[in-house]
């Protein structure tokens, strides 16, 4: 007789990982959570809204995970997973409610799984949302030893008449960029081609650790700004950089004019460019130091930047909107 364990699935290790994961998930629970982790489904009670709309998003971390495997550092990529989902739904003004994760591996190691979920938990705490469920799949022979994949699913809520969809954007509105923490979770297939020695020094740290800096989560500053200002459009700068993501906030045919010299370019991007990437390709691939973009009325610009600074963020007027063809023009 062949056992499940002999086939490569360790049920006992699965039980152990669930116990380790529960303590991290419970730290994220908010008032709306109705049941504990381990049920067949997570349940969440909706707060009182007049005309609520649920806003959802799903994403993963991509090949940044390979850097984590090679550095044997697993407790930050969970933050990336949350950030990639949460920042997307934030673009429509949604307040995050809850999050679910999915972890897949060839051989389950409970301590590594727990570190991954520790990162997810930290990301949820930063996002003020609850981790109410997830799945850990052990699939022997499907993944190479020591490799994991992680993805997530986020749900937020917004009043229907307060959803930000870009329909109020006008010619002459300005664009405010909020600084990123590095490459975030995009462009790592290219980075891995160029950076072979992850233990090489970069500004007093191993470059592998620098590349594992978690994706910034913009929930707290943006939700505070939404209480005070008429924000007309928002963009999460991910894969495709400025060129692909900023036009996604436009409902009509506008062009975003971005001044490359309006903010300081972080050294990690200058370093990557020095390894052989053309500048235009950099802007087509990376966030180039700006992880989130707001489209606002010009009269609010200075006050928004001031508020961002007071909240510990770096905000810059990076450009403006003009009539065009859903494109980005760099100057």
Curated annotation (Swiss-Prot):
Gene3D superfamilies: PurM-like C-terminal domain, PurM-like, N-terminal domain. Its EC number is 6.3.3.1. The keyword Glycoprotein does not apply. Its main location: cytoplasm. CDD domains: PurM. GO terms for molecular function: ATP binding; phosphoribosylamine-glycine ligase activity; phosphoribosylformylglycinamidine cyclo-ligase activity. It is found in: Cytoplasm. GO terms for biological process: 'de novo' IMP biosynthetic process; adenine biosynthetic process. Pathway: Purine metabolism; IMP biosynthesis via de novo pathway; 5-amino-1-(5-phospho-D-ribosyl)imidazole from N(2)-formyl-N(1)-(5-phospho-D-ribosyl)glycinamide: step 2/2. SUPFAM superfamilies: PurM C-terminal domain-like, PurM N-terminal domain-like. Keywords: ATP-binding, Cytoplasm, Ligase, Nucleotide-binding, Purine biosynthesis. GO terms for cellular component: cytosol. It catalyses: 2-formamido-N(1)-(5-O-phospho-beta-D-ribosyl)acetamidine + ATP = 5-amino-1-(5-phospho-beta-D-ribosyl)imidazole + ADP + phosphate + H(+). It comes from the Bacteria. Signal peptide: none annotated. Belongs to the AIR synthase family. This is Phosphoribosylformylglycinamidine cyclo-ligase. It comes from Clostridium botulinum (strain Langeland / NCTC 10281 / Type F). The gene is purM.
